[in-house]
């Protein structure tokens, strides 16, 4: 005879742990106090709370003089958004040591120092936008004159790179190319360059790696430059950057991998850390899912299986739009 009550009201064991509880707003006086209680809320708030704790631990150790080399990776859409300025602040204040991004993460940073991107909408007539020469990145609009202006700067910059390569007798690596682009910004652009990632990376000698440097408008400009001039001299060396990036991981006492999004920057960083037995700390912020087997969706624990993150590493993954959580994360760590 079934005993419904025993099934429904099954006895449970007592468990120890953190009580799930949110902030009581009568007792909180600031948003900072609210966020400080995120670890107890549950779901992704708890993951954000843990990310704050991990990065604070990293910062506290660095402030004491301990060596933790911080690798920051992000995709181009991060720079398309207003997160660009937050990353530029981190670079200005030397809160990161190594950057890996995509071509868009380089060129859009430069373009924004010329003209801004404009807030639009998600639901629009894209065919009409095309007629008007307006490109769309989600709800961000990029008029095509931004790229026309970009070309005006890139052609003389390519000429400069050619001269440097002739003087050195070898191609520049992508990271050297980006360093020279920062120098070029310093010489040619005005006050707006002071919110640029590339500019501050140049000033503080923080390397920016971009293994897919031609996969964007820079590649378009290189195509026009080479075709119109029948140039075969200008070459960007990717191979030697692999040595430099990997050695930055190998020679570090400890490393931290902070990844916004997925794609190439994520793998370039964690694969470099494989050469030292894995990263000691990792913070992933992503909306990618793990069940399609993609690298973008692979959680930190999967990286442990490859040796790219250490088994005893302190890590967390936040499943959220980075534009929502990264500003909170940085503020809570750097402005506490």
UniProtKB/Swiss-Prot annotation:
Highest taxon of source: Archaea
Keyword tags: Hypusine biosynthesis, NAD, Transferase
Biological pathway: Protein modification; eIF5A hypusination
GO molecular function, one term: deoxyhypusine synthase activity
Example of a GO cellular component annotation carried by this entry: cytoplasm
Record Gene3D superfamilies: Deoxyhypusine synthase (3.40.910.10)
Reported cofactor(s): NAD(+)
EC number: 2.5.1.46
Catalytic site positions: 308 (nucleophile)
Disulfide cross-links: none
Cited Pfam families: DS
Reactions listed under catalytic activity: [eIF5A protein]-L-lysine + spermidine = [eIF5A protein]-deoxyhypusine + propane-1,3-diamine
Enzyme class: transferase
HAMAP family: DHS
Protein purpose: Catalyzes the NAD-dependent oxidative cleavage of spermidine and the subsequent transfer of the butylamine moiety of spermidine to the epsilon-amino group of a specific lysine residue of the eIF-5A precursor protein to form the intermediate deoxyhypusine residue.
Family: Belongs to the deoxyhypusine synthase family.
Record protein name field: Probable deoxyhypusine synthase
Gene name of this polypeptide: dys
């Amino acid at each position: 005879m079934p005993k419904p009550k025993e099934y429904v009201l099954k006895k449970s064991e007592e468990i120890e742990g953190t009580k799930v509880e949110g902030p009581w707003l009568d007792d909180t006086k600031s948003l900072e106090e609210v966020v400080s209680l995120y670890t107890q809320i549950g779901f992704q708030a708890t993951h954000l709370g843990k990310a704050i704790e991990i990065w604070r631990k990293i910062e506290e150790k660095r402030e004491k003089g301990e060596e933790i080399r911080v690798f920051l990776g992000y995709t181009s859409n991060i720079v398309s958004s207003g997160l660009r300025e937050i990353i530029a602040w981190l670079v200005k204040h030397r809160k990161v040591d190594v950057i890996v991004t995509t071509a868009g993460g380089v060129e859009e940073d430069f373009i924004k120092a010329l003209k801004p991107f404009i807030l639009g909408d998600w639901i629009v007539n894209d065919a009409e936008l095309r007629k008007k020469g307006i490109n769309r990145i989600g709800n961000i609009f990029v008029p095509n004159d931004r790229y026309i202006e970009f070309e005006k700067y890139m052609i003389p910059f390519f000429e400069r790179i050619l001269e440097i390569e002739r003087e050195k007798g070898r191609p520049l690596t992508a990271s050297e190319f980006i360093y020279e682009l920062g120098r070029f910004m310093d010489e040619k652009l005005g006050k707006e360059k002071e919110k640029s990632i590339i500019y501050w990376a140049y000033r503080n000698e923080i390397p920016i790696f971009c293994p897919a440097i031609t996969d964007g408008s820079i590649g378009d400009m290189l195509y026009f430059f080479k075709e119109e001039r029948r140039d075969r001299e200008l070459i960007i060396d990717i191979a030697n950057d692999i040595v430099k990036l990997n050695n930055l991981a190998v020679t570090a006492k400890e490393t931290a991998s902070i990844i916004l999004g997925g794609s190439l920057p994520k793998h370039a960083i964690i694969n470099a850390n494989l050469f030292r037995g894995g990263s000691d700390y990792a913070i992933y912020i992503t909306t990618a899912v793990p069940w399609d087997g993609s690298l973008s969706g692979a959680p930190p624990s999967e990286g442990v299986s490859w040796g790219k993150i250490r088994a005893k590493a302190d890590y967390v993954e936040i499943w959220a739009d980075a534009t929502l959580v990264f500003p909170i994360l940085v503020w809570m760590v750097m402005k506490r």
